[in-house]
Amino acid sequence: MAAKQVAIIGAGASGLCALKCCLDEGLVPTCFERSGDIGGLWRFEVNGPGLEKFEGWYLHSRDYKSPQSFLGKRVVVVGTGNSGIDIAVELSHAAKQVFLSTKRGTWVMHRVADGGYPFDFTYISRFIQLLLSLLPHTTTSFFMERKLNARFDHALYSLQPQHRIFDQHPTINDDLPNRIISGRVKVKPNIQEFTETSAIFEDGTREDIDAVVFATGYSFSFPFLEGCMKVVENQIPLYKFMFPPDLQKPTLAFIGLIQPLGAIMPISELQCRWATRVFKGLKDLPPSTNMLAEITQTKEKMAERYVKSQRHTIQVDYIPYMDELASQVGVKPNLLALFLTDPKLALEVVFGPCTPYQYRLRGPGKWAGAREAILTQRQRVVRPLRTRARERPGHASSVPHIFKVFFSIGLIVATLVYVSLSP
């Protein structure tokens, strides 16, 4: 039987991943890319009240390349997502003054966690995910907000929003508070209107400006699929954010059309692994009515949880969503089996960072090196930091032995609880 041919629209990060997964499954992929290079192309709009009158320079964050063009300028950056804050911080080293305009404020997390490990390496774990699912939303929000405010008071810095920390997509930046306290970045409310040479903000203040950078996000559309896929308010009804529910045959999948609370690349790969097996007929989708019901349920849960905005229409929780995809492919880690046969690996899978190696331990695409990669990932993270030969001081432990015993027992109990509650 001849191998099936697959058209991949777009040679962005997810498109390249789709190419690789198609080849892994013995399919014949052809990738179509409109631009002259790989890497992706997002759609965006630049607008604002009175912008047509503004005599200065304005652009979208996608077109921003370097702060040198803004040397000595007074610049407004509109939007406090990750792109907006990163650009504002970088511009503040070259521009005369940077104004950061925010509609509702934001909570700012930092890249480096306690002890110097990357934030996601410390907090994106199955154990932390279990705690978040067991504890009340208000409790987890309180503790995380308190931790962030211990670093810098968001209200004092004019950044604190009305919503809670877990009601938004995370904004991450280490340098913003330093740039605000030095006066190089000034936080302002939403822009009411532009004049020829200035921006008037909703609090009535006016600032003379030379340039505007709109970091207001992107929109998506599928003009080549207008007959069967309609985007309404930046939303599209897809089963598991991938499959249209009303096609006669499952021959169409959307890859990477999500905004995860974690890295997007591992999710795109798992989506591709599932989609290719569906295309080959190795996996079936549920009936259309079941898919529509789940789509509606997911949309309702998202509306209850997140701030209403274009930014929060395709949110997914990193580990739960990855596990959903992995279950479909047949590669979700069997925690109980791991705990019984390889407790050392099981503890790292549960309490360590949830890296993509976990989905190469079993099933289709199993990799013999996955176990070793998981057990050595901490060493690989810290190795680049050890650039000065030095022996660690040999301090005697201040923790009594009995406490260590109880802590070890607690770890085992927590693991068993996770295993029993994990779907």
Language-model segments: which ranges?
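Flavin (primarily FAD) cofactor-binding/catalytic cores of flavoenzymes
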Residues: 2-118, 123-291, 303-423
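Short, well-structured alpha-helical segments that form the helix of a local strand-helix-strand
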Residues: 291-299
